[in-house]
Amino acid sequence: MGQKTALGTLLKAIGNSGQGKVVPGWGAVPIMTVIGLLLLVFLVILLQIYNQSLLLQGFSVDWNGN
């Protein structure tokens, strides 16, 4: 059998703490909704920068490498 380490003991305690338990009600839905919306906003901003429809002062987008 392998050695017992403090890190292994900590990770095992964290990993097994909620095993088999379901949070009643909405659970993690609100948190995941917020994270999803933030990701969507981030991707829309990236798309607007790529399409140059979002103009940033002092920031030029040149895809030719010039």
Curated annotation (Swiss-Prot):
<comment type="subunit">
    <text>PSII is composed of 1 copy each of membrane proteins PsbA, PsbB, PsbC, PsbD, PsbE, PsbF, PsbH, PsbI, PsbJ, PsbK, PsbL, PsbM, PsbT, PsbX, PsbY, Psb30/Ycf12, peripheral proteins PsbO, CyanoQ (PsbQ), PsbU, PsbV and a large number of cofactors. It forms dimeric complexes.</text>
</comment>
<dbReference type="GO" id="GO:0031676">
    <property type="term" value="C:plasma membrane-derived thylakoid membrane"/>
</dbReference>
<keyword id="KW-1133">Transmembrane helix</keyword>
<feature type="transmembrane region" description="Helical">
    <location>
        <begin position="27"/>
        <end position="47"/>
    </location>
</feature>
<dbReference type="InterPro" id="IPR036863">
    <property type="entry name" value="PSII_PsbH_sf"/>
</dbReference>
<dbReference type="InterPro" id="IPR001056">
    <property type="entry name" value="PSII_PsbH"/>
</dbReference>
<dbReference type="GO" id="GO:0009523">
    <property type="term" value="C:photosystem II"/>
</dbReference>
<dbReference type="GO" id="GO:0015979">
    <property type="term" value="P:photosynthesis"/>
</dbReference>
<comment type="function">
    <text>One of the components of the core complex of photosystem II (PSII), required for its stability and/or assembly. PSII is a light-driven water:plastoquinone oxidoreductase that uses light energy to abstract electrons from H(2)O, generating O(2) and a proton gradient subsequently used for ATP formation. It consists of a core antenna complex that captures photons, and an electron transfer chain that converts photonic excitation into a charge separation.</text>
</comment>
<keyword id="KW-0604">Photosystem II</keyword>
<dbReference type="GO" id="GO:0050821">
    <property type="term" value="P:protein stabilization"/>
</dbReference>
<protein>
    <recommendedName>
        <fullName>Photosystem II reaction center protein H</fullName>
    </recommendedName>
</protein>
<dbReference type="GO" id="GO:0042301">
    <property type="term" value="F:phosphate ion binding"/>
</dbReference>
<keyword id="KW-0812">Transmembrane</keyword>
<keyword id="KW-0602">Photosynthesis</keyword>
<keyword id="KW-0793">Thylakoid</keyword>
<comment type="similarity">
    <text>Belongs to the PsbH family.</text>
</comment>
<keyword id="KW-0472">Membrane</keyword>
<dbReference type="Pfam" id="PF00737">
    <property type="entry name" value="PsbH"/>
</dbReference>
